């Protein structure tokens, strides 16, 4: 198509500047430099780099990137050549090859169009959908195969639930032990009072000894609380700081992932559009004018992929460290809990074994009599008042005897 025009067609650069340059690359053992080429005759006046593969001479050098235009190979111009011819030119050179290029000075923000934003939103929606649901809704899916982070996320959620359950159980355990220690303290106070008031020396000493044992158990319980409480703090730190921080990192990773997938989907759509126009024999404007829009998306995809790879690496490292901390921390916390409770029960057993004072001989008769001595009977004030009123209203027997018996009229008669 452009042979008749002799490539005398104005390029639509979309305001993106280019800077010429050249780079010499050392080929690898497979005689490759690690780039894929697109464009070229007969549909596009420019021949450009589509992708730079990882761990290849071009990627390790870092000079050329996706979207850069190739203008020559070892000083030979490639104007008017197809991408297959240029690939053969590069393969024919052994050892070092010099690539002449026009560097695309693209701004990634220029490629972040509304279409990319909407694609990111769509990816968020279909992330948790099954393939059947997405197909039924007519939503295309761009997913990462063998994404191990999905399983790691599920493991992280299970770990969070485990720590949450341990935290609640530890709180309840501390609360119960505190109430138990207060109960032992109350027992100690009661038996101490009984021992002080007990007149029998042997029984008094036994009650006091038993009271001291319960007070010691109360101290052991407080010591247990002080030892286990840092465990609760550590669990809360892991649950409320470490895991949320990892979730935030994963959230950032997902945002970068969806952006990268959106650019991948955009590139595929533009490729399909180009292939359709070629099949119909109709020229596509963006391809005929240098395909700068497509090259901009290629550059944005490459940079998004680099960010995605770095973020993925960071997330994997952070989750690996979190797993190691989880394994080490959970063992340490459980050992501290078991050892503390074991010491508590051993100390309680030792104290109660020494305080085996039962049966206690108590002289109940003597104690009851002693408690009952010198105690006046309690009388209610109201009963005393009633007795006084009765005494005032009824004459005494002496008075009635002096006056004689009552007559029929109810008056006293003399005998």
Swiss-Prot record:
It is a peripheral membrane protein; Lipid-anchor. Residues 376-415 are annotated as: Disordered. The modification Phosphothreonine is found at residue 82. Pfam families: Arfaptin (PF06456), PDZ (PF00595). SMART domains: Arfaptin (SM01015), PDZ (SM00228). Keywords: Actin-binding, Calcium, Cytoplasm, Cytoskeleton, Lipoprotein, Membrane, Metal-binding, Palmitate, Phosphoprotein, Synapse, Synaptosome, Zinc. GO terms for cellular component: cytoskeleton; neuron projection; perinuclear region of cytoplasm; plasma membrane; postsynaptic density; postsynaptic early endosome; synaptic vesicle; trans-Golgi network membrane. One of its GO terms (biological process) is cellular response to glucose starvation. Zn(2+) binds at residues 44, 46. Phosphorylation at Thr-82 appears to inhibit the interaction with AMPA receptors. Residues 377-391 have a biased composition (Acidic residues). The AH domain mediates binding to F-actin. The unoccupied PDZ domain is probably involved in allosteric modulation by forming an intramolecular bridge with the AH domain leading to a 'closed' formation. Binding of a PDZ ligand, such as GRIA2, allows enhanced interactions with F-actin and the Arp2/3 complex thus enhanced inhibition of actin polymerization. PANTHER family: ARFAPTIN-RELATED, PRKCA-BINDING PROTEIN. This is PRKCA-binding protein. It comes from Macaca fascicularis.
């Amino acid at each position: 198509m452009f042979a008749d025009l002799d490539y005398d067609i104005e390029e639509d650069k979309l305001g993106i500047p280019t800077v010429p340059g050249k780079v010499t690359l050392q080929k690898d053992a497979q005689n490759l430099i690690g780039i894929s080429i697109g464009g070229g005759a007969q549909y596009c006046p420019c021949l450009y780099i589509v992708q730079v593969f990882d761990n290849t001479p071009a990627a390790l050098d870092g000079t050329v990137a996706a979207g850069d235009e190739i203008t020559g190979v070892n000083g030979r111009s490639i104007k008017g050549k197809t991408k297959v011819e240029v690939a053969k030119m590069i393969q024919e050179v052994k050892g070092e090859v010099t690539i002449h290029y026009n560097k695309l000075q693209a701004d990634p923000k220029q490629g972040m169009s509304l279409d990319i934003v909407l694609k990111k939103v769509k990816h968020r929606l279909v992330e948790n959908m099954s393939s059947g649901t997405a197909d039924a809704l007519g939503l295309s899916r761009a997913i990462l195969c063998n994404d191990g982070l999905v399983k790691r996320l599920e493991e992280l959620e299970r770990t969070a639930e485990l720590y949450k359950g341990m935290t609640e159980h530890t709180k309840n355990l501390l609360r119960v032990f505190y109430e138990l220690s207060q109960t032992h303290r109350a027992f100690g106070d009661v038996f101490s009072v009984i021992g002080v008031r007990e007149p029998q020396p042997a029984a008094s000493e036994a009650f006091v000894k038993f009271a001291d044992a319960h007070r010691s158990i109360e101290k052991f319980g407080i010591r247990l609380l002080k030892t286990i409480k840092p465990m609760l703090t550590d669990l809360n730190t892991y649950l409320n700081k470490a895991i949320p921080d990892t979730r935030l990192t994963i959230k950032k990773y997902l945002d970068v992932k969806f952006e990268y997938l959106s650019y991948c989907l955009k590139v595929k759509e533009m490729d399909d559009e180009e292939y359709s126009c070629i099949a119909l024999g109709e020229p596509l404007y963006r391809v005929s004018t240098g395909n700068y829009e497509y090259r901009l998306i290629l550059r944005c995809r490459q940079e998004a992929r680099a960010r995605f790879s770095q973020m993925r690496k960071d997330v994997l490292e952070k989750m690996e460290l979190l797993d190691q901390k989880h394994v080490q921390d959970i063992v340490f916390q459980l050992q501290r809990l078991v050892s503390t409770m074991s010491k508590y029960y051993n100390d309680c057993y030792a104290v109660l074994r020494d305080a085996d004072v039962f049966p206690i001989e108590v002289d109940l008769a003597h104690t009851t009599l002693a408690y009952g001595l010198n105690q006046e009977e309690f009388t209610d004030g109201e009963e005393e008042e009633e007795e006084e009123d009765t005494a005032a209203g009824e004459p005494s027997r002496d008075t009635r005897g002096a006056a004689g018996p009552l007559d029929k009229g109810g008056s006293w008669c003399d005998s």
